[in-house]
């Protein structure tokens, strides 16, 4: 009898313990009341430690919908779980080794990022949704003040298959660096993206961690950037429309200069200076102040600023008249955007719309300026990671519409370069022709004479080139060290396989010859390794299995950016791997890249 009593007592204890365990699990996993705020790591990133406190997200509750528990368990918990495998390999957001590959999973994520997005998604994910960026404005801009009665802004961001981390970093940068009373709303237009994380997971994140003024509109089919922006603008209710790309980061005091000019003249369209975010390293760097132009192939180009634009009393902070805009980032009074005809809805997807709206602004009574005191960073990719839905050449289609509506007799300059397009169909332009008449627009000759006199017209009577600001070229980076790149284990030096001047040539290990100047490397403050003062050591960002080669120095970092780290390793920033000797026993001396492990095959020293 006693044994039976003890047995049931034990059963009771077990049942009670199990009940409390279940209750505590439910409470801590599903309660939404008074849970402590914590850093939100990025899904899919590699191992790294916690980021500094100043980078922690500032959470703001979105609209209070009842959350589905299963969704929370499967999506949001996975979003918060960074799958940290080795916290000792912690990396700060400013680390040059933020893109380091630790395992095959990191390598797959990095390679997938270049394939899907044409930039380093591994680094993007590790950066998180908040980071500090350098204030790249001229010092005079920091002393400027702006009116208190500025108009409110609707930020329109159209995206298609964007990287989740890049999109949210764009949104958070706007929320973090825009005064709340000026930010009327952020409208995200999903142009029928295919990626799952841009659907329910994005909605849930916005609901939980962003203000209610962040809204998502989803197109039922692919409309393209042009019509996507028109859809976003149709939903906007702020006084000013600000269009941004989906892989940007706005800088400090970015919005106030734009709004101040529009407050002064609602018929003025303004663009920020577009700073550079490297596609390979995501490093943020300043851009020079230039202005937009175009060529007779109807492609946008950047021009130096004419001397005539630089003599005003405001000096380096003065707005710069720009004949055209790049198109990705600009602000415009919402009513003026509608009155001026929005975009040409007959244009498809992307391409040419920036020139069309630029010509229309100037020819129909408006103004277009670039503002040096407004800065926005933009990831500049080397290619577009996606095409048109049907594979059509939208740039040609859109350029033809532009030429036939706005160029008048100067469209023959375009057709002289593209005679194959003279009889190509471009759709019905009657509405746009009628719009031009209704707005009472000037001729294209007026535009060339008054807005872009620097534009050359080929022919025997070509006008002389107008003077422009002298460009003295970029300053040469300072040399930090000069010597032979010595491999500690083999006692050999890294040299060119053939001539040191051969572009695309391989490098390998050979016996060091201290009398041979072609074995001498220069390491400079831009982290370039230059052999014989001729070519840079370069890696393919998209084919990390390829060996390093000697290529012309491009000065953009990324594929030519190397750092000497601990354990004498030579780390390639954009590839995220270290230089190694392929086989220590092989006399051929071939080198390649591998996951950094501090092994003897990866130990190098630059010796004078």
Swiss-Prot record:
Region of interest: Catalytic subdomain A: 150-261
Sorted UniProt keywords: Disulfide bond, Glycoprotein, Glycosyltransferase, Golgi apparatus, Lectin, Manganese, Membrane, Metal-binding, Notch signaling pathway, Phosphoprotein, Signal-anchor, Transferase, Transmembrane, Transmembrane helix
Sequence ranges assigned to domain Ricin B-type lectin in this UniProt record: 476-607
Domain of life: Eukaryota
Disulfide bonds: 141-373, 364-441, 493-512, 536-553, 578-596
Lumenal topological domain residue ranges: 30-608
Residue numbers spanned by region Catalytic subdomain B: 319-381
Expression tissues: Mainly expressed in kidney. Weakly expressed in other tissues.
First-listed, main subcellular location of the protein, grouped into a coarse class: Golgi
Sites where the protein binds substrate: 191, 222, 246, 350, 381, 386
Matches recorded under SUPFAM superfamilies: Nucleotide-diphospho-sugar transferases, Ricin B-like lectins
Domain notes per entry: There are two conserved domains in the glycosyltransferase region: the N-terminal domain (domain A, also called GT1 motif), which is probably involved in manganese coordination and substrate binding and the C-terminal domain (domain B, also called Gal/GalNAc-T motif), which is probably involved in catalytic reaction and UDP-Gal binding. The ricin B-type lectin domain binds to GalNAc and contributes to the glycopeptide specificity.
Subunit structure and binding partners: Interacts with NOTCH1.
Recorded family membership: Belongs to the glycosyltransferase 2 family. GalNAc-T subfamily.
PANTHER family noted in UniProt: N-ACETYLGALACTOSAMINYLTRANSFERASE, POLYPEPTIDE N-ACETYLGALACTOSAMINYLTRANSFERASE 11
Official protein name in the record: Polypeptide N-acetylgalactosaminyltransferase 11
């Amino acid at each position: 009898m006693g044994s039976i009593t003890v047995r049931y007592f034990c059963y009771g204890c077990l049942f009670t313990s199990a009940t409390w365990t279940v209750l505590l699990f439910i409470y801590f996993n599903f309660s939404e009341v008074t849970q402590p705020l914590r850093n939100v790591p990025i899904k899919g990133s590699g191992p790294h430690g916690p980021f500094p406190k100043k980078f922690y997200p500032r959470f703001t509750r979105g609209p209070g919908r009842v959350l589905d528990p299963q969704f929370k368990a499967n999506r949001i918990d996975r979003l918060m779980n960074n799958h940290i495998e080795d916290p000792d390999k912690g990396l700060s957001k400013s680390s040059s080794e933020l893109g380091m590959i630790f395992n095959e999973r990191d390598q797959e994520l990095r390679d997938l990022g270049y394939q899907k997005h044409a930039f380093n998604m591994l680094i993007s994910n590790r950066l998180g949704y908040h980071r500090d960026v350098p204030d790249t404005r001229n010092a005079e801009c920091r002393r400027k003040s702006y009116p208190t009665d500025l108009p409110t802004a609707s930020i329109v961001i159209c995206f298609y298959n964007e990287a989740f981390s890049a999109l949210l970093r764009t949104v958070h940068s706007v929320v973090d660096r825009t005064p709340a009373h000026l930010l009327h709303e952020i409208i995200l237009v999903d142009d029928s993206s295919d990626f799952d994380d841009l659907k329910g997971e994005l909605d849930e994140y916005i609901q939980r961690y962003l203000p209610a003024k962040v809204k998502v509109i989803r197109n039922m089919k692919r409309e393209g950037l042009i019509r996507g922006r028109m859809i976003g603008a149709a939903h906007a209710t702020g006084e000013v429309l600000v269009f941004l790309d989906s892989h940007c980061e706005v800088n400090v005091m970015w919005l106030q200069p734009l709004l101040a000019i529009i407050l002064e003249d609602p018929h003025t369209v303004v663009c920020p200076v577009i700073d550079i975010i490297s596609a390979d390293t995501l490093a943020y760097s300043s851009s020079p102040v230039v202005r937009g132009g175009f060529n007779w192939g109807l492609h946008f180009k950047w021009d130096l600023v004419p001397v005539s634009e630089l003599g005003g009393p405001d000096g380096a902070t003065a707005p710069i008249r720009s004949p055209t805009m790049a198109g990705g980032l600009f602000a415009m009074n919402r009513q003026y955007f509608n009155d001026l005809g929005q975009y040409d809805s007959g244009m498809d997807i992307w391409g040419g719309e920036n020139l069309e709206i630029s010509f229309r602004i100037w020819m129909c009574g408006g103004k277009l300026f670039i503002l040096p005191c407004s800065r926005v960073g933009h990831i500049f990719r080397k290619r577009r990671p996606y095409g048109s839905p049907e594979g059509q050449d939208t740039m040609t289609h859109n350029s033809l519409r532009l030429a036939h509506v706005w160029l008048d007799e100067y469209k023959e300059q375009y057709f002289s370069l593209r005679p194959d397009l003279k009889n190509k169909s471009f759709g019905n332009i009657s509405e746009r022709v009628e719009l031009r008449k209704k707005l009472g627009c000037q001729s294209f000759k007026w535009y060339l004479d008054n807005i872009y006199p620097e534009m050359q017209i080929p022919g025997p009577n070509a006008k002389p080139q107008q003077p422009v600001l002298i460009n003295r070229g970029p300053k040469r980076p300072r040399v930090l060290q000069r010597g032979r790149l010595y491999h500690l284990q083999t006692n050999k030096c890294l040299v060119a396989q053939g001539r040191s001047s051969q572009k695309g040539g391989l490098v390998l290990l050979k016996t060091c010859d201290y009398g041979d100047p072609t074995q001498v490397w220069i390491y400079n403050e831009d982290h370039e390794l230059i052999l014989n003062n001729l070519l840079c050591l370069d890696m393919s960002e998209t084919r990390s299995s390829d060996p390093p080669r000697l290529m012309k120095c491009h000065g953009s970092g990324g594929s030519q950016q190397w750092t000497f780290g601990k354990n004498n390793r030579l780390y390639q920033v954009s590839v995220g791997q270290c230089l190694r000797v392929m086989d220590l026993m092989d006399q051929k001396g071939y080198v390649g890249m591998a996951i950094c492990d501090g092994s003897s095959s990866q130990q190098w020293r630059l010796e004078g």
